[in-house]
Structure formats: C-alpha cells, structure tokens
Design a protein with these regions (language model features):
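Residues forming the flavin
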Residues: 1-259
C-alpha cells in the first residue's frame, strides 16, 4: 500500500522484495507443502504480498480510524479484484486464492504508474551517513527516504538494524497452539444442525479469564480452512491457519492463546 500510494501521487517508488513474485511464490509454497523442500526466501512468510497472502485474508481490525483509512483499504482491494461483499460484511474475508490475484493486480498498477519492484532482493545493510541501502550484500542504492516494511519473521533484518544502533524495544507476546476440528461440529453448535444449507461455515471466538490472572482466548479462527506449515527457516516449524474464499474445507481451525 505504501508503494501504491506513492505511485498514485506521482512518485516512482522502488520496492525491494526479498522473495519471489506471487505466482512464482505460489508454486514454491505448493512444492514445499508437497515435498518439504523449503526456499528460505520464498515461502508462506516471504515473497510478494507478505505473510498475509497465505494467511487467510481476514480483514479484521480493532483500531478505530476516524480518517477512513480502513475503508480505503477495503475499497482498494475491491478495485483490484476482491469481492464487493468485504465492504459490508461484519467480518470481511477475501481468501488466499483471491488475494493472489489482488496482489498481482496491485503490483501491475504500481509498475504502470512508473514504480519498480526488484524481486529476490534483500536489504542487507543501511548506511545512513551515505543515505544508502545495500541490497544482496553488493548493490548500493542511494535514497533520501526509505520505508522499512519488514513484515513477519525477518529476524535477520531486525538483527542488522540492531547492529546498526537503531533504537528498539522488546514487545510482549502470547504463546499458543492451533487446534482443528470438523466444521460440522462448529456448524451444529452454531446452527443447531450439521447441514447448514446456504448458511456460511460457522465461526466462533472464545475467551476466558482465569483466577490466577492469566487469560486464554481463541484467535484467527478459520472456518472451512486448513492448518498449514508456515515455516520460513530450515529445521524450524511454524504453523498457521488459512482458508480459501469459499471456506469449503471439511475442518475448522483456530489458534488458542495464553497470556
């Protein structure tokens, strides 16, 4: 969105993406799911569209925005191919299958307006005194302004910034697991019967405050979805939940988080 807005205002942004274009990335992800062969720079976390492309496409936010930016995001997604129902649904959802098309369409618009996107390119250093960034350890690019949209799991980039003396602070986090159960079980509890007809796959959100002050709650519930391997490092495991637009999978899943 940053690149898109800059291009809309007449700038020619250069977007540096460590991963692959979304179509190539889709093939890398599918190969990983089938064979276990991981590309550390093109996977569920890294590549065009970021981690969100393969993370269900839910568009929920608890941030109140009087300036209308949340609405702008939804309208922009529709402009580039997302279903119009995200404009009025209480819990708008695009789905990974449609997000791939939306991401590609946004990229094409950015380049049409004069922007550039360099794939398989990673910022490996910043040199503030020279107003430069270093790409892939060798190419130096001068710029008066750089936006670091680090995203999810780029701990090597965070380490580089720390080594460069960038101020940063720790952030609290929650720990949990992802659970999976038949979608028919959730439908039966929500609708009173397993056959839901034309009703959508049912969802849920649960929370509990314990006597010891700890909390437990469900998060990122995926009706009719899938639990997927979301690893981005060799010999490391990360799991995530996702669903396609139709939410037609046999199972539902959700993260269960403790604080």
């Amino acid at each position: 969105f940053c690149g898109y807005l800059l291009a809309q205002e007449g700038y020619c942004p250069l977007i540096i993406e460590r991963g692959a274009p979304v179509r190539e990335r889709q093939k890398d992800v599918e190969r990983f799911w089938k064979t276990g062969v991981l590309d550390p720079d093109s996977n569920v976390q890294f590549g065009e569209g970021g981690a969100g492309t393969f993370s269900d496409g839910k568009l929920n936010t608890l941030v109140k925005d009087a300036k209308g930016r949340n609405r702008f995001v939804l309208e922009t997604f529709v402009k580039f191919g997302a279903p119009e129902d995200i404009l009025w649904e209480q819990k708008p959802h695009i789905g990974t299958d449609i997000l791939i098309d939306v991401v590609e369409a946004m990229r094409n618009k950015i380049t049409e307006l004069g922007g550039e996107i360099h794939f398989h390119s990673m910022v490996t250093d910043i040199i503030p005194e020279e107003e430069s960034v270093v790409v892939n350890g060798c190419e130096k690019i001068r710029t008066s302004a750089a936006v670091l949209a680090i995203g999810h799991s780029a701990k090597d980039t965070v380490q580089m910034l720390f080594d460069r003396g960038v101020d940063m602070s720790g952030k609290s986090f929650a720990v949990g697991v992802r659970v999976e159960h038949p979608q028919s079980l959730i439908d039966r509890n929500a609708y009173g019967r397993e056959e839901r007809g034309s009703l959508p796959a049912a969802a849920y959100k649960l929370t509990e405050k314990l006597d010891n002050g700890r909390g437990v709650y469900t998060f990122c519930m995926c009706p009719g979805g899938y639990v997927v391997n979301a690893s981005s490092e060799p010999e490391r495991l990360a799991v995530n939940g996702m669903s396609y637009h139709g939410r037609a999978g046999e199972n539902a899943n959700s993260a269960v988080i403790v604080t």
